[in-house]
Amino acid sequence: MSVKKICFAASSGGHYEQLMMLQPLMEEYNSFVVTEKTIYKSSVENKKMYYVSQVNRKEVSFIPRMILNLFKELYIFLKERPDVVITTGVLAIIPLCLFAKLFGKKLIYIESFAKVTSPTETGKLMYKFADRFYVQWGQMLEIYPDAVFLGGIY
C-alpha cells in the first residue's frame, strides 16, 4: 500500500484554526495545506501552502472570486494529486472538495465546532458528497444521522 497524500483545506479564521488542530496528522503524511490568503500569516512548518482568494457570498465580488478559486483549486489539485481531502470548510474550499469527488478521491468533512444545533450551509452540501462526515457535537447527529461523532477537535 502506498503512502497517501493528503490535502488539508479550510477557509481563514476559525475554520483554519480548527484545521490546525490536525497538525499531528499532517506530520504523519505527505500533505499540503490550502487556505484563503489573508493579511495575517497562515503557515504550517515544513508543509507546502497554497492560497486562494477570500470569498464572502454577500459581496459583489463573490462570483468572480469563486470563479478564480475554481481555476486555482483545479490547478492545485492537478499539480498535487491528493488521495484524500480533509476540510473544515467553508465556501472558498468547495471547488477543491468537488474536484476530489470528480477525480474519485476521498473527501473527509469536519463540521464546524461552532455549530452545536444547526448545520452550516457548506456542511449541508458536503454531507451529500463526503466519504466521511464528522460532527463535533452529539446533538448534530440528529441533523446528520450518518455522521461520525468522536467529540470536539479541541
State where each predicted segment sits.
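Conserved nucleotide-sugar phosphate-binding/catalytic loop shared by glycosyltransferases and other
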Residues: 10-12, 30-65, 139, 150-153
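Extreme N-terminal starter segment of soluble prokaryotic enzymes
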Residues: 2-6
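An amphipathic, basic-hydrophobic alpha-helix
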Residues: 60-83, 102
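Short amphipathic alpha-helix
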Residues: 14-27, 38
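Short beta->alpha connector loops
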Residues: 12-15, 37-38, 90-92, 113-117, ...
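An aromatic- and histidine-rich active-site surface loop
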Residues: 82-103
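Active-site-proximal region of nucleotide-activated glycan assembly enzymes
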Residues: 105-154
